[in-house]
Amino acid sequence: MIANLLNYIVWDPDPILAHLGPMTIRYYSTCWMIGLLLGYLLMSKLYKQQGLSDEKFSPLFLYIFFGVLIGGRLGHCIFYQPEYFLTQWDHFIEMLIPIHHMPDGSWKFTGYEGLASHGGVFGMFVGIWLYCRNMKVNGWVVLDNMGICSGITATFIRLGNLMNSEIIGKVTDVPWAFIFVREDQYPRHPGQLYEALAYFCFFLLILFIYKKRGPKSVGTGFYFGLCLTLIFTFRFFIEYTKEIQVAFEAGLPMDMGQILSIPLIIAGVWSIASSTKRAKEKNVEAK
């Protein structure tokens, strides 16, 4: 392995993109925003193609943005760092407000460095549920459009993790291994890059199927279910290439990412299966 060190990719980018006065702009949060923006723009186009009004669509971004942000943050704090965030009052404040209580008693703006993808998905569900209830729209249509767009957002989220040198893989001697200098000097699987590439491929695949079959030739819930099934099945298996993120995972048969992926895979399979029934019911109504 030592002889091959020169062939590995040495990865040590500065996670900070820029400083704006007291504020720190990080690649991680920037990638999140780019991913959400691209998803929003694509969904806006889908809404127009499907003849859905701008008045109905405009509020959706805010529901999803805050749902993903709050859910992702709570998911990280509760599932991955409960011993820090749930033990002291000032740490509890840091769960939702991107500030850190300094030893001298002052507060420092830090930006969100910890957002869990599973928590973001659950938060997105809550945001969409509130949106559909308040705007009186078909939830399955919204979820299908989300399923078509989510892959591109997930791609940029994982690129943000890569820029942060976090969620690193296990030690390996594959020729494309990364040496994450901020962690240690061992070549490791670039798990973030694996996921980013896979999610981008899933995005292209789902978009291709949608363009071929459209929204009406399949039952509602199909694209949403396909997205959940593809992404979280891959996520389940790619976890085997990653280092554990929290100590208590070492004693578990599966890590937290795998445990949280299982209900989402089941939901995805159910959504695909039940979409056939909804398609048949729709055809009967049309006759």
Go through the PLM ranges and name each one.
Residues 1-287:
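A feature for loop-to-transmembrane-helix boundaries and adjacent hydrophobic helices
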